[in-house]
């Protein structure tokens, strides 16, 4: 009798502890940061981010990660200096986490709360707007994260004793698909 009760209990409760209701995979991604100096500005671009979303009970948790050294500005000296300034050897990954309602994929715009780990620091960004476009089973998400150097306690690099501006917006263009 106890064995039957235990078996019934396990059969009823295991699905609640089981796998996700649905999952999303990052298919392609372009991330671009922009820094500006009175004498010039530059952008670093990466196409190597990886990501996954796990949805359960109406909520989706997303994680996106990209190597700091994967950003390319077109100037290898600048890229090496960027890795040094951002402590990329010690903290080689940028990690972004967010939680969204599963129904968010049905809207044209989402406002996401982001947690970003970069250069050994964690910064929170509230209600960052992203545009969504769904075609077939692919969902394209694009927007700009209003990051700053000071958010991550990065000393602004300087050229001719003039530091770059604190603003470091990151343009995001991602394509996701359900797994």
Describe each PLM feature range.
Residues 19-179:
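Low-complexity, acidic/polar, glycine-enriched regions of mature
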Residues 1-6:
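Bacterial N-terminal signal peptides that target proteins for export
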Residues 11-18:
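Hydrophobic h-region of N-terminal signal peptides that target proteins for export
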């Amino acid at each position: 009798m106890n064995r039957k009760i235990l078996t019934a209990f396990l059969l009823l409760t295991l699905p609640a502890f089981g796998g996700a209701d649905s999952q999303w995979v990052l298919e392609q991604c372009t991330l671009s940061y922009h820094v500006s100096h009175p004498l010039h500005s530059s952008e670093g671009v990466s196409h190597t981010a990886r990501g996954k979303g796990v949805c359960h009970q109406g909520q989706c948790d997303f994680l996106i990660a990209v190597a700091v050294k994967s950003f390319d500005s077109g100037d290898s000296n600048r890229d090496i200096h960027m890795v040094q300034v951002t402590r990329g050897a010690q903290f080689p990954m940028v990690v972004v986490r967010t939680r969204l309602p599963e129904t968010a994929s049905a809207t044209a715009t989402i406002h996401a709360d982001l947690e970003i780990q970069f250069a050994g620091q964690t910064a929170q960004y509230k209600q960052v707007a992203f545009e969504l476009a769904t075609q077939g089973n692919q969902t394209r998400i694009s927007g700009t994260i209003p990051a700053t150097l000071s958010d991550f306690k990065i000393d602004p690099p300087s050229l001719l004793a003039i530091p770059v501006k604190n603003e470091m917006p990151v343009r995001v263009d991602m394509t996701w698909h359900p797994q």
